[in-house]
Amino acid sequence: LELYKEVKNTFPNLDDFKQQFTQAYSRYLVLFPNDKIPTIVTSVPGLDTQWPSVFLYENDLNIYLDMYLGADNKIYKQSGIPLYISERMDKKFLLVDCFKKAIVYKQLPEKTLVTLLDRVIYEGKKLYFTQTMLPNEPLENIIGYNEEKFQWAEQNYGKVWAYIVENNLLYSKEENVIRQFAEEAPFTNPFGNNSPGRMGQYIGWKIVSAYMQNNSEVTLEEMMKNTDSQNILNNSKFKPTK
């Protein structure tokens, strides 16, 4: 009952959100005209953080509103959800998540992600796609960092990349290596507590952005469908300074 109350307080109505979504989706339809706008379906399943907070099923865009109550919400604290997860459980991330966690899969081909590079490029595509659909959204919201973490990533991604390359981790198939750089974590090992997690995703976004900048003849759709991670890396000419 308390959860429903919190949802009602946070989302007295969804008019603004629906308007923003429709606007962003019309941008999507210009690039992918064979698609149709999904129906928004909201529910409150009861804080299941193991399940995506937004997902597509047929033509329904399902949104779990109890996953967007704000990082400081007492229910999240009582439920023991760690801060690095709850930081993104805020309604300012809802529109981003609709594209990053759901709509993007309409354009991402199924691919077995074998190496860290595969995963990095895959995650980078999701972020680049979302940024293209939401050009007015602050970049830190698209990446899912607060301002401090975003600044750290911006200043240090060259160091993280150098570490990955110098330690021969780029083509690693080890699950723990892929997890270390590409999945949810309070920080990125071995860069200390000030670093954000998911630095591999951030680097992937940088590589894909460089690829699109250096290959202006490539369309968004072509890039999304290109499953050759090495090809994207090579043609990105990505060479950050340490």
Where in the sequence are the language-model features?
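A cross-kingdom marker for long, charged
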Residues: 117, 121, 126-242
